[in-house]
């Protein structure tokens, strides 16, 4: 191998690990399985290509359950989170690609145990793959452009002995943007996007085309105001059910108008967002963030159209704790590369769960109107770390006229998810941590006919564990978890619950 080849090879880093877990589950409630042990093997391979070179690949490939005895039909639970970027033509043509595979749930109205050894017919293997070629460049000193073609596929597979899975969907989003920045942050932006959604069931596709012009004015270095206007043309296909077509195809076109602002009162505080009027009413996206030396706070409020593959791509596994730690460490570690390494080290040392609680992304045949509010915070101390989040997310299927679909064709999809979660880690010694987590979520129907029985569901997951380093490359943990699910008001047999005791050993190669 040449010296250049050696240099390139050294940029790639692989990290393999393998583990074994033994779990004893005690079940309470009607129609529950017998108590028993479940033994599982797991494996993972981490890939990090570094930031140099034209091809960058980062992420992990593995299985949370590679081989199990007992459990839900000797289940296989893959876990993949990969991102790749190829600079095909220097500083001009790029290709982004992602692959995410994890275990998820069909409906928020069903049981959602976080412990994979607790069986449920609501669980399936969710897969999301995307390929996005794009070009970008500068055509004048202050004018830049981007043309991007996002392609997202969401195949799925059943988990264990359950037959539940979602149809394969496809989303294409062709978007272009040209913008200019002048003065202290003012300027203009031209945008166009054409989104096409194939739900994998109906023969037609949903098409949404939007063109916008945005003008911004910098009042001062801290505040920028903007006005936005445009036009949209949408096409919704006919929806079909058991008895044929239930809702004819529809189309809509109209003017878009609105405004927004970006406000930076201090270097640690930011308020950004916009409001628009569209065919379904108000559309908005507001974000508030603030950081202290050890704390990162964030609040988000959104309302707009969305699709199942869109959400599967943007939030495949929940809100990551790493992004909050990155903000909290910004003051102490200005360099982004060193800060990323510090975040990874902190997560490894504390054993803090990598994600915060978030609403369940579930399959839906139509484009939906999503209205979401969330508040999150992460505190990173010397011996303690704490993360919490609260969320409320309302989902409504809508027609091309902007009104809600009749309940007969909503398939139980219109609902409101409300919940929250807290993660806590305490360092007992240099090699041992106490970790605890609790997540509670309530799902309610938002119409009188979209959900069988018109019931709500309650899901509660919690665990506490002690993690320790047994050897330089070997770690172990013991823990206790509890899960309960019930549907108040339904004609069921009461709540069900599971208490689990487990022990895990993991070795890094």
Task: Please give the residue ranges for each predicted region.
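Gram-negative and organellar
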Residues: 2-509
């Amino acid at each position: 191998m040449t010296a250049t080849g050696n240099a390139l090879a050294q940029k790639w880093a692989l990290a393999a690990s393998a583990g074994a877990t033994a779990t004893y589950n005690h079940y309470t409630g009607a129609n529950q399985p017998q108590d028993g042990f479940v033994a599982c093997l797991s494996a993972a391979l981490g890939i990090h290509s570094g930031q140099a070179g034209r091809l960058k690949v980062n992420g992990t490939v593995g299985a949370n359950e590679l081989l199990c005895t007992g459990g839900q039909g000797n289940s296989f639970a893959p876990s993949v989170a990969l991102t790749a970027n190829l600079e095909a033509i220097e500083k001009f043509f790029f290709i982004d690609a992602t692959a995410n595979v994890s275990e998820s749930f069909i409906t928020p109205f069903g049981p959602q145990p976080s412990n994979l050894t607790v069986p449920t017919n609501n669980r399936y293997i969710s897969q999301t793959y995307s390929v996005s070629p794009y070009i970008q460049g500068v055509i004048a000193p202050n004018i830049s452009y981007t043309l991007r073609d996002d392609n997202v596929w969401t195949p799925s597979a059943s988990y264990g002995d359950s037959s539940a899975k979602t149809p394969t969907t496809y989303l294409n989003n062709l978007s272009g943007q040209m913008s200019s920045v002048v003065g202290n942050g003012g300027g203009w932006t031209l945008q166009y996007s054409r989104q096409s959604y194939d739900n994998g069931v109906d023969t037609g596709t949903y098409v949404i085309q939007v063109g916008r012009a945005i003008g911004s004015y910098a009042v001062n270095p801290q505040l920028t105001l903007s006005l936005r206007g445009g036009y949209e043309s949408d096409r919704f296909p006919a929806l079909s059910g058991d008895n044929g077509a239930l809702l004819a195809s529809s189309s809509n076109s109209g003017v878009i108008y609105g405004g927004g602002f970006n406000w930076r009162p201090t270097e640690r505080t930011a308020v950004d967002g916009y409001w628009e009027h569209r065919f379904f009413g108000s559309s908005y996206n507001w974000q508030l963030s603030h950081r202290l030396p050890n704390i990162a706070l964030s609040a988000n409020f959104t309302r707009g159209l969305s699709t199942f593959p869109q959400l599967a791509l943007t939030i495949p596994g929940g809100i990551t704790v790493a992004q909050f730690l990155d903000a909290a460490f910004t003051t102490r570690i200005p360099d982004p590369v060193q800060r990323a390494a510090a975040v990874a080290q902190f997560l490894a040392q504390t054993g803090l769960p990598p994600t915060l609680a978030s609403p369940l992304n579930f399959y839906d045949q139509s484009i939906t109107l999503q209205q979401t509010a969330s508040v999150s915070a992460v505190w990173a101390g010397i011996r303690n770390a704490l993360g919490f989040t609260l969320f409320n997310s309302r989902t409504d299927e809508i027609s091309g006229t902007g009104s809600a679909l009749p309940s007969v064709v909503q398939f139980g999809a219109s609902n409101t998810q409300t919940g929250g979660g807290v993660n806590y880690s305490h360092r007992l010694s240099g090699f041992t941590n106490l970790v605890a987590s609790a997540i509670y979520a309530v799902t309610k129907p938002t119409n009188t006919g979209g959900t069988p029985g018109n019931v709500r569901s309650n899901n509660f997951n919690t665990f506490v564990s002690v993690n320790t380093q047994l050897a330089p490359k070997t770690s172990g943990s013991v823990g206790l978890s509890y899960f309960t699910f019930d549907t108040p008001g339904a004609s069921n047999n009461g709540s069900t619950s599971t208490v689990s005791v487990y022990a895990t050993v993991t070795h890094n190669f």
